[in-house]
Regions:
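Mature catalytic domains of secreted/periplasmic carbohydrate-active enzymes
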Residues: 1-140, 145-163, 172-184
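Exposed beta-strand face motif in extracellular beta-rich ectodomains
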Residues: 167-169
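Short beta-strand edge segments in extracellular beta-sheet folds
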Residues: 187-188
Length: 190
């Protein structure tokens, strides 16, 4: 929990992973009349980014029909969701990484248009980051704040409101508990 929530607590501490449960449909069970109401791939992708990219696991219910099979509408949206997630992952921008004290810098070989930043703590070391500021820069210009995050954990996907073109992305951890361990930091092409 937050430092404020823990201030007056003297018992043992435990970390529990967050979990997001939803269904491909508006309910948990299959009804033939709902085959045209399966959630869209864009809605499911948004839920995936918000859950997996929000330090949680994503449990997606796909209800079988009365024959024990998945409806074609569900299978189609799952295939398209898989393609969309694969596309997101394939847009990782190659960069060199420099770690120094509380700052991680990604340097690109040329200006790149960035649509998201992914931060991942080494959970084996604990969830420690309370706040981080993400800035971008094109060589020869000043730093520009593009995002501020509270809590990173397993994975934080920071989708930028507006893509930025940069030669460098910098993540500055401004508050943490006993240091921090960023297992991975990368930018995703817009």
């Amino acid at each position: 929990g937050s430092r404020e929530a823990l201030a007056d607590y003297s018992g043992p501490l435990a970390w529990y992973p967050a979990e997001v449960n939803t269904s491909t449909r508006k309910g948990w069970f299959h009804h033939d009349v709902e085959d045209s109401q399966v959630r869209s791939v864009d809605e499911l992708f948004s839920i995936w980014k918000g859950s997996v990219g929000g330090n949680a696991t994503f449990l997606l219910n796909v209800p079988p029909n009365r024959d024990g099979l998945l409806a074609d509408a569900d299978v189609e949206v799952l295939a398209r969701l898989g393609e969309k997630i694969a596309d997101f992952r394939s847009r990782r921008i190659e960069a060199s990484r420099e770690d120094e004290a509380n700052v991680v810098t990604l340097r690109f070989d040329a200006p790149r248009t960035v649509g998201a930043i992914v931060l991942e703590e080494d959970i084996a070391q604990g969830q420690r980051i309370d706040e981080a500021v993400v800035t971008s820069c094109v060589e020869g210009t000043g730093e520009q704040e593009i995002a501020r995050v509270h809590c990173v954990g397993y994975r934080r996907i920071v989708t930028l409101e507006k893509p930025v073109t940069a030669t460098r992305i910098r993540v500055t951890v401004t508050a943490s508990r006993q240091g921090f361990y960023l297992a991975d930091v990368y930018a995703v092409r817009a």
